[in-house]
């Protein structure tokens, strides 16, 4: 048994303008090469664009997008008797949100467009409406889990 204590769970801090943890999680995932101020600029510009496009609160659009993209179940590779099986596992809320943010940013980076703020705002609006690349990724993950349901007992 380990003599070290268990690590404390870190709670995500909230960002300075919207006072929201999801925005801060998004900022920390969009961050590249330690340029946090640039990450904040991109996020806030994207929020302004969402405000202009939808004429609603951008935080509610963000919450709706993340709720729509968050997966309930995913597959994990598990080696059993020389062969690798994709075993479906349930995902907790924190891990699900982290995956959703990662997928949203990945989908927005792939989008053609002028700048990251524009691409991110478009992806968030699409995800809130129930379309877009990130939603497709979630559905694909759920399909994979459903197809490999027979291996659920390997969990």
Curated annotation (Swiss-Prot):
Keyword Ribosomal protein listed: yes
GO molecular function: rRNA binding; structural constituent of ribosome
Major site of localization recorded for this protein: plastid
Top-level taxonomic group: Eukaryota
KW Chloroplast (keyword) present: yes
UniProt cross-references to InterPro entries, sorted A to Z: Ribosomal_uS7, Ribosomal_uS7_bac/org-type, Ribosomal_uS7_CS, Ribosomal_uS7_dom, Ribosomal_uS7_dom_sf
Family: Belongs to the universal ribosomal protein uS7 family.
Function: One of the primary rRNA binding proteins, it binds directly to 16S rRNA where it nucleates assembly of the head domain of the 30S subunit.
Assembly and binders: Part of the 30S ribosomal subunit.
Protein name as catalogued: Small ribosomal subunit protein uS7cz/uS7cy
